[in-house]
């Protein structure tokens, strides 16, 4: 899959989908939506030990600047409209990672009257990261799986 022998003539050919997806996988800008204890693990993933910058991942403070939303923690009914509003402010294409048991399906508080039983009822989720709370390695693996999913997506030829 390398280009070692292709540069003999001075140019390389590829399709535009591969080029765009290569750029998207190498420059994901997530916006954090930390709601509970899973947000601490998300912060740890962005710190120097795991260093998401080496994957081209830079946390952005605004939804208008991000293309990935990481929902971490218990989503309450009162917070659900805010989650949807922030998701709608993100530019296309956009992806969502659901981090932790509470964001995936309500977790420990599943039977509480005030908890949404999974953030996928509010926004479409692309990657689920299990755990209570999931480790930083699990979130990193989920981000790598999202990069693989983006790489396989047909961007132009739909």
UniProtKB/Swiss-Prot annotation:
Question: Where found, per UniProt?
Answer: Cell inner membrane
Q: Its Enzyme Commission number?
A: 7.1.1.-
Which lineage do the record's taxonomy fields give for this organism?
A: Bacteria, Pseudomonadati, Pseudomonadota, Betaproteobacteria, Nitrosomonadales
Q: Which residues bind [4Fe-4S] cluster?
A: 37-38, 102, 132
Spell out where the chain crosses the membrane: none
What protein name does the entry list? NADH-quinone oxidoreductase subunit B
**What keywords were assigned to this record?**
4Fe-4S, Cell inner membrane, Cell membrane, Iron, Iron-sulfur, Membrane, Metal-binding, NAD, Quinone, Translocase, Transport, Ubiquinone
The answer to whether keyword Metal-binding applies is: yes
Q: Which Pfam families match?
A: Oxidored_q6
Q: How is the cofactor bound?
A: Binds 1 [4Fe-4S] cluster.
């Amino acid at each position: 899959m390398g280009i070692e022998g292709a540069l003999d003539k001075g140019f390389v050919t590829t399709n535009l989908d591969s080029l765009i997806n290569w750029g998207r996988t190498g420059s994901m800008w997530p916006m954090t939506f930390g709601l509970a204890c899973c947000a601490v693990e998300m912060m740890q993933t962005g710190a120097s030990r795991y260093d998401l910058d080496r994957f081209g991942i830079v946390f952005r403070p605004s939804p208008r600047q991000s293309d990935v939303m990481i929902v971490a923690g218990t989503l309450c009914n009162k917070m659900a409209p805010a989650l949807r509003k922030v998701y709608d402010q993100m530019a296309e294409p956009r992806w969502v990672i659901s981090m932790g048991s509470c964001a995936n399906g309500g977790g420990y508080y599943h039977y509480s009257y005030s908890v949404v039983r999974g953030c996928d009822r509010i926004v479409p989720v692309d990657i689920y990261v299990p755990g209570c709370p999931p480790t930083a390695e699990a979130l990193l693996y989920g981000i790598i799986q999202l990069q693989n999913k983006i790489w396989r997506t047909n961007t132009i030829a739909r």
